[in-house]
Structure formats: structure tokens, C-alpha cells
Amino acid sequence: MKVRQLFLLSIMLLAACTTAPTATPQPETESTSTPEATETEAAIAATEESVPTPRPTLGPDEWMTLPVVPEVTDTAREIYARGQELGRDPKHFSKVGDCQTNTGFYLVDFDNEDAYGLGEYAYLQDTIDYYEGSFSRTSLAMRDGYNVAAILTPLRADPKQCEKNENPIACEFRLHNPSIAIISLETNFSDRPADDYGKYMRQIIEYSIEQGVVPILATKGDNLEGDHSINAEIAEIAVEYDIPLWNLWAALQPLPNQGHSTELNDGFHLSFSRNFFDKPKNMLSGWPWRNLTALQALDSVRRGLQEQ
């Protein structure tokens, strides 16, 4: 039985961004290391704290029509208010994710005024200024090779910065003390159903809520599983917990090749241009839209949370 448990856990933790081809336009070298077979600590159990009453479920493919930029609900305001009582920093947000998050392409440029141009989206500058420092921060809850289970597993945490038995998301929340977490986990375990993805994602969401951190949950741009089941699960979770959903998938659909690289043509890696939103040619690529809509989602949530 013990050998079987070790084998199953090892399989669950192996898959993340390695499901895509190893060629990548990203400047960083993605990790090729995998969890040791000796990993025995399971992902943390779902919090025993009460959670919001489930909302009505979405209809088939209804998630595809949900807006790209979310609106803030009373539930999100309640989470934020609890976080303020706990001492969460209103000017900090954290990134939670895998290799598509752990890259210099994602949000980092907004901490460098020469690296982006807002154009018609100049109203977003207030949000860039408000969260200065969080855009380029290397979160302890993002890393190449992470998936929904790894985020919850102490053995995947940075041993130099995290405490013993502390998982990556708990470590990040302790060290950065955010009031908001943008959660974008693109990949699932190999050949496992979306229900398994949802089981772990719910633990991440419930832990964030318990800690007074407002989760912004993102759909993914790809459909590697073939039936959009993971995005459907992500949207269902957002509706269930009444939390903000950033529908990245919808933003990418009008773009050439749905915003994915035509050179790699793997349906996973986004096409790249720099974040100058006033240059029409740049806005034909996926990465500027990922960064723009992430910033728009953050801006909408910030403004909504601050409304009295």
C-alpha cells in the first residue's frame, strides 16, 4: 500500500509545463527537474473553515461567454475586509502559477516605466503605481514545474525561504502579505480528469479565502486536454465561490492562431511582442493581451474592493 501511495503521488506531481514541448520563447531556462520518488507528503487537506454557499452551475460552454475582466462581488469585498482585519497589505498582490507565470514576460514590465506603453489604456497607470513592486516580485508560489498539487505541497516549497512543513502558497502569503492573489495554473496532471484539477484548486481557493486574500482566478489560453474541461472547471469554481474570474481564454480568441506562437505551433506557448499597447502590430500577439487583461482584471478588482 505504501509503495502504491508513493507511486500515485509521484505521478500527480510530475506533470506541469512539461506537457508542452521543451522549446520555448521565454528568456528563462525552464526547470527539467522532477519531484523525487521519496516525496511522501500529500497536498494539504481542504480547510475546515466554512466556505461560501455554492452558486448555480454554469451551462455547457457558458464559461466561453463570460467577460474577460471581472466585476467585484460582495463576497470578494467580505474576503478583503477580513484580510484587512488580519493585517494584509492592501498594496501587495501575489502571483500564483507555473512556467507561464514564472517568466519575465508576465507582468514584470509594469515595474519598469520604459518597458511598456499604455496608449488608450492610460487609466491603468493608477493601478500600476498602487501595486509597485509586486509586478516584478519573484513569488514563492510560482515556479517551472508547478501544478495545482505542487502549490499545496511542502516538499515543493523553497527550502531557503520557507519554513519547515510550509507549502509554497502559505510561504508566499507569509512573506509578501498580499491582499490579492492572481492564480493562473495552466497545466494539469498528465491524462487526469478536470475533476482532479478542481479538487486541488478548491483547496487553493479555500486557503486564500481563509487567509483574507482575494483570489483572481484565470482561465488558461490553451486546450491541451482537447475538450476545454479544465477551463470549464476553473469557471465553475469561480462561480461556486463567487470570486473574480479573469477570462484570458476569451481575450485570446480573436487573435491570429488564438494568440499562440505560429513558430512553435504547439497550442500552448503564446506569441510574443513587447507590452506597447499603442502599437497595433504588437497587439496581434498573445503576450501583450495576457498582460493587458491581467492588469485590467487587477484594476477592476482594486477599484471594486475600495468602493464603499
What are these regions (language model features)?
Residues 182, 188-189, 202-234:
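Active-site segments of SGNH/GDSL-like serine hydrolases
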Residues 9-12, 16-67, 71:
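Ser/Thr-rich, Proline-interspersed low-complexity disordered segments
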Residues 89-92, 176-182, 209-216, 241-244:
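Loop/turn elements at helix/coil->beta-strand transitions in domains of secreted/extracellular proteins
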Residues 222-308:
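Catalytic His-Asp segment of secreted/periplasmic serine-dependent ester chemistry enzymes
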Residues 96-99, 183-188, 218-222, 247-252:
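Active-site-proximal beta-strand/loop segments in catalytic clefts of secreted hydrolases
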Residues 1-7:
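Bacterial N-terminal signal peptides that target proteins for export
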Residues 83-196:
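Conserved SGNH/GDSL esterase-like catalytic core that processes O-acyl groups on lipids
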Residues 51-102:
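N-terminal module-boundary/linker segments of secreted carbohydrate-active enzymes
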